[in-house]
């Protein structure tokens, strides 16, 4: 008999479905139903010489949560392959909930409810054509390929309705997405997808991707089953061909090389802000190179951010947590007298997180998972399989059809607009008429660890 998962379509073959069976693809319980499909008649058993069955005896196999990585070791032992996982780590980390905002009472005084708060955010204040947005929270880089066309366009439309910005991701420019966005940040990657004079002139900012938090030092990978004709055309690849991005720019070997690229892009874009994105690792050493290159903005991607697919143990064992990364980056830039715009990303979810990050010194916040959740994401955490049941992280036409673009657009806009209003609320209750006047003086922490390794005092 066959049983098919109603969520992701995985088919289980067996005489009987085990009780409380967990789907190995989407990890859902109780979602299987009987399934019939035409099959070829099996060959005589004597003539069949199949591969060695490495699965553990189901009668005695078990999982012990107290045994560290038992499940993962079993999986690698049977498959002979590294484990890849989607979204961000679920390991415990220093969290934004351990930081608290101090409401003003008498000294200082709070603002009245409804009093106007300035939220205008300028990225690249010294650029010839700075990027100006009314919402300091924008949608981070996620590629067309990892995400469906419908997801990308609805995110762009939602960001436009919220007077925010949309990022291209490393897969090049999807024209419909760029047209839908109010402000558009183009990601410049080693493969140079969509790099031409027109795209450089018409993007509102350009960001050089050096790394990302979930897989620092590693290039991106898009499996062939996600490479449709449209994606292949944008990336200059063959349909169905696996696409691997280099882990570094071959022509950036020194800080002088990076500075030269920044200047080339600044000229080619006719003065748009040029940024550099790095994973939070050797923060001060990397920032030394970045500052020398004189970009208009720097993005720090901290531990806690997400990805469509990353080697599991790479994701679990790398990158400085976002709170510490932001503190160290702000401290370094202040120490060297730099006013380069600082953008933080990596695991920030809601308005209180955004307000705390701005108080710690971020000029803007880039979000990915939160925007996807607002759109339609239900956190099945199977993005890398291409079987996303809500139509976001897939190129399967029938699954893509499940994402209702207009509704997704409005949900994203609602989330960003509500977040902006709540940011204004946090500014008022701390006594600030300008959101960007939030500072370390408006924060305390209930974490001894955070108080010891940042400049946030303990409550």
Give the ranges of each region predicted by the language model.
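Residues immediately within or flanking Cys/His clusters that coordinate Zn2+
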Residues: 2, 20, 385
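Short, cysteine/histidine-rich loop/knuckle motifs that typically chelate Zn2+
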Residues: 6-7, 24-25, 387
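Short, non-ligating residues that shape and space the ligands of small metal-coordination modules
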Residues: 11-15, 32-33
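Short linker/helix segments within small regulatory modules
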Residues: 14-22
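Conserved, well-structured core domains of diverse proteins
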Residues: 29, 37-137, 141, 146-157, ...
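Active-site-facing alpha/beta catalytic cores
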Residues: 127, 134, 141, 146-264, ...
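Glycine-rich phosphate/ribose-binding loops and adjacent secondary-structure elements
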Residues: 249-400
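Gly/Ser/Thr/Ala-enriched C-terminal appendages of enzymes
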Residues: 349-458
């Amino acid at each position: 008999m066959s049983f098919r998962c109603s969520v992701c379509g995985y088919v289980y073959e067996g005489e009987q479905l085990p009780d409380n069976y967990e789907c190995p693809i989407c990890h859902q319980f109780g979602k299987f139903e009987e399934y019939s499909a035409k099959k070829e008649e099996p060959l005589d058993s004597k003539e069949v010489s199949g591969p060695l069955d490495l699965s553990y005896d189901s009668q005695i196999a078990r999982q012990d949560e107290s045994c560290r990585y038992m499940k993962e070791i079993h999986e690698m032992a049977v498959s002979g392959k590294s484990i890849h996982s989607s979204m961000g780590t679920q390991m415990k980390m220093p969290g934004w909930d351990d930081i608290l905002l101090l409401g003003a009472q008498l000294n200082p005084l709070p603002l009245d409810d409804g009093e106007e708060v300035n939220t205008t955010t300028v990225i690249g204040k010294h650029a010839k054509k700075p990027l100006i947005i009314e919402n300091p929270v924008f949608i981070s880089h996620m590629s067309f390929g990892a995400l469906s066309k419908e997801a990308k366009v609805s995110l762009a439309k939602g960001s436009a309705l919220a007077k925010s910005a949309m990022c291209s991701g490393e897969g090049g420019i999807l024209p419909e997405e760029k047209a839908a966005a109010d402000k558009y940040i183009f990601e410049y990657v080693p493969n140079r997808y969509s790099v031409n004079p027109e795209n450089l002139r018409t993007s509102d900012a350009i960001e050089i991707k050096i790394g990302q938090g979930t897989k620092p030092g590693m290039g991106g990978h898009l499996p062939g089953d996600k490479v449709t004709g449209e994606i292949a055309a944008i990336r200059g690849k063959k349909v169905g061909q696996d696409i691997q991005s280099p882990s570094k720019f071959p022509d950036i070997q020194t800080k002088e090389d990076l500075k030269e690229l920044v200047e080339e892009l600044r000229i080619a874009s006719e003065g748009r802000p040029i940024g550099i994105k790095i994973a939070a690792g050797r923060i001060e050493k990397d920032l030394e190179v970045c500052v020398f290159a004189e970009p208009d903005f720097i993005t720090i991607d901290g531990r806690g951010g997400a990805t469509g697919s990353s080697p599991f143990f790479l994701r679990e064992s790398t990158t400085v947590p976002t709170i510490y990364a932001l503190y160290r980056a702000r401290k370094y830039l202040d120490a060297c007298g730099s006013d380069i715009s600082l953008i933080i990303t990596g695991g920030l979810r809601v308005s209180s997180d955004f307000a705390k990050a701005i108080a710690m010194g971020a000029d803007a916040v880039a979000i990915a998972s939160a925007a996807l959740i607002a759109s339609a994401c239900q956190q099945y955490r199977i993005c890398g399989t291409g079987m996303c049941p809500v139509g976001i992280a897939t190129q399967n036409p029938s699954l893509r059809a499940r994402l209702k673009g207009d509704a997704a657009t409005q949900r994203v806009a609602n989330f960003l607009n509500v977040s902006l209003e709540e940011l204004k609320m946090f500014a008022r209750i701390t006594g600030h008429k300008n959101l960007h006047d939030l500072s370390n003086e408006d924060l305390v922490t209930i974490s001894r660890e955070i108080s010891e390794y940042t400049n946030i005092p303990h409550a």
